[in-house]
Amino acid sequence: MSNDWIFGACAVPDARMRSAALARQEQLTKPPGALGRLEQLAVQLAAWQRTEHPAVQRVWIAVYAADHGVAAEGVSAFPQAVTGEMVRNFARGGAAIAVLARELGARLEVVNLGVVNDPGDLSRVRRAWIAPSTANICEQPAMTATQLRDALAAGAHSIAQAKGCDTQLFVGGEMGIGNTTAAAALGCALLSQFPQALAGAGTGLDAEGIAHKVTVITRALALHADASTPLERLRRLGGFEIAALVGAYIAAAQAGIPVLVDGFIATAAALVASRLNPGVREWLLFGHRSQERGHAALLRALDAEPLLQLDLRLGEASGAAVAIPLLRSACALHNGMATFAEAGVSDA
């Protein structure tokens, strides 16, 4: 299997349903625009879902876990063993995203793409093993071409499953010690930014730790300066879980499934996906603005206005999950409010 599928055409939102939803908003018992962005969200969901009555009840959350060779450079406040330990925590339902998924009634898929501290086969975890970790991006490309292909395909596999369940919204998350370093390096390469602009605290680095992280990213960018395409930059600087998110976002857009993007790492993947296949951008909604330093720059590059700003920086799809009730409220208001005619209320 080649990577040619990632360049395939994306679905097109339904303009007729968008117009119908806009017309309904104009007839609801409220001043025009009084519900602000909630109105826009309902209209956008109607166009995506090709219905006058959008809903966000069937939600698929996929969390991709993978380790990074660059962790050997000491770029995280936590040891690399944590990635595998968190996979086990996801499976047991103790992680933040597991709690949120239960609260939302969402389907949670956990995918083990390769971790150093491998917990082995676990119930509720899909094993899509590639390698124990990527290579150290300061020494060589993160992935081989085959590994990149497999990681992209792992994300697409999630979408195939989600589509089979008539999913109304896809949310992607990640777990991997060292992945903010990979995401920052990738963002720098794509946006021609200096590492100081995108490198942040990650799991909790102090100022000295962030300065070291900047040095590590600078070394990686120098080594891979000849990478000229988004796909090659992803292969050299990214991670298995970042590539899986890229594959999921592209496959979702091709399948016509709306995507709610999480934080810094997920947005880096969204930027790659949109550069590889520009049609993807039309299917992306952004859940929150992370506290991670580089997230704002990535959002600007995507012309994205996130729904929330709560100073979150956990990852796991947790910030996006917190935004889902907003989407549900938008749909409930759109579908449930009376029109002026139904309520016998005078229009303006």
From Swiss-Prot:
This is Nicotinate-nucleotide--dimethylbenzimidazole phosphoribosyltransferase. The gene is cobT. Catalyzes the synthesis of alpha-ribazole-5'-phosphate from nicotinate mononucleotide (NAMN) and 5,6-dimethylbenzimidazole (DMB). GO terms for biological process: cobalamin biosynthetic process. Belongs to the CobT family. Coiled coil: none annotated. The active site is at 316 (proton acceptor). GO terms for molecular function: nicotinate-nucleotide-dimethylbenzimidazole phosphoribosyltransferase activity. It catalyses: 5,6-dimethylbenzimidazole + nicotinate beta-D-ribonucleotide = alpha-ribazole 5'-phosphate + nicotinate + H(+). It comes from Xanthomonas oryzae pv. oryzae (strain MAFF 311018). The keyword Glycosyltransferase applies. Pathway: Nucleoside biosynthesis; alpha-ribazole biosynthesis; alpha-ribazole from 5,6-dimethylbenzimidazole: step 1/2. Its EC number is 2.4.2.21. Keywords: Cobalamin biosynthesis, Glycosyltransferase, Transferase.
